[in-house]
């Protein structure tokens, strides 16, 4: 088997309107195609709608076919976008286990939840991998195999899991970037939980779930998607944001009351009840304003019932 990496614009001619590229094939790949597939061509034509939006293609990596389809990785250049002038319209994000991203819009006080299917995907693949592993290892043990090895099926399941999760994270972060562009948001502030992951002990089962969540990948995907629209991306240290009332004078240890964060994702403050993750997103933005020296009134009216946005898996 051979994989091919085509570098440079001289090897790639594009018809941008049609979403088609024509590739000049290197000798080694032409020989491989002739001997393996009896294909005698000097050029390879690829047509896909994704090529329409691409600027200068820098590299194409083509991998051998599996079950009738090829894997192609395209590396292309995107021109730098100048950061937009700050207009005071911001979005804050609280990252969590069951609600992957809970968002707060500073202009209208709207809150919404993205990424609920993530945990469902993780659970499905964990169960399926565990089931197949138990069967496979049982078969090997029955045959007296001393050193148990993994199987092709298990490796493919891990790959499917990785690809499915990556695809879903791209869809969720793309939805968020498009929302910000359409609404005229110029700054996105997300809670920075990297230190929390290292330092907190939340119990064995919660630790296991919490430490497996791909927050770094979410940060990277969000940052480059927002950057394309000139939207500023900030990671804000988020201590006490989930424990302080949205009505407290400030977000900090002095006003933290963990007992007010109740079961089923609720935060109770006297006779007022809010969604706990929405409170977290709201307080992350308050904390960012505090450390930035910004004084701005924010609405708490949308903290009770966030809208749940469904993104197709």
Where in the sequence are the language-model features?
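Single conserved hydrophobic/aromatic residue that forms the stacking wall/gate
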Residues: 1-13
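Structural motif
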Residues: 3-4, 52, 83, 180
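Polybasic low-complexity intrinsically disordered regions
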Residues: 14-89, 93-99, 105
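Positively charged, helix-rich recognition surfaces that bind polyanionic ligands
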Residues: 66-313
């Amino acid at each position: 088997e051979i994989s091919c990496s085509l570098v440079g614009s001289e090897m790639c001619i594009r018809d941008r309107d049609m979403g088609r590229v024509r590739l000049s094939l290197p000798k080694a790949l032409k020989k491989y195609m002739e001997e393996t597939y009896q294909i005698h061509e000097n050029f390879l034509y690829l047509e896909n709608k994704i090529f329409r939006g691409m600027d200068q293609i820098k590299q194409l990596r083509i991998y051998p076919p599996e079950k009738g389809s090829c894997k192609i990785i395209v590396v292309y250049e995107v021109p730098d976008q100048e950061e937009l002038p700050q207009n005071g319209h911001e979005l804050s994000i609280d990252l969590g286990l069951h609600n992957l991203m809970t968002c707060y819009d500073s202009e209208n006080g709207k809150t919404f939840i993205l990424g609920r299917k993530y945990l469902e995907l993780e659970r499905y693949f964990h169960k399926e991998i565990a089931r197949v592993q138990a069967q496979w290892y049982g078969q090997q043990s029955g045959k007296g195999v001393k050193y148990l090895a993994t199987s092709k099926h298990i490796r493919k399941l891990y790959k499917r899991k990785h690809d499915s999760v990556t695809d879903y994270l791209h869809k969720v972060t793309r939805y968020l970037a498009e929302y910000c562009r359409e609404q005229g948001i110029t700054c996105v502030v997300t809670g920075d939980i990297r230190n929390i992951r290292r330092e907190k002990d939340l119990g064995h089962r919660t630790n296991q779930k919490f430490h497996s969540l791909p927050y770094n990948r979410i940060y990277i995907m969000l940052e480059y998607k927002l950057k394309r629209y000139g939207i500023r991306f900030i990671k804000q240290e988020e201590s006490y944001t989930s424990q302080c009332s949205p009505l407290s004078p400030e977000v900090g240890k002095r006003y933290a009351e963990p007992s007010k964060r109740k079961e089923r994702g609720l935060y109770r403050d006297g006779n007022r009840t809010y969604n706990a993750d929405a409170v977290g997103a709201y307080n992350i933005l308050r904390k960012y304003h505090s450390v930035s020296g910004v004084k701005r009134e924010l609405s708490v009216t949308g903290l009770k019932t966030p809208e749940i946005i469904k993104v197709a898996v």
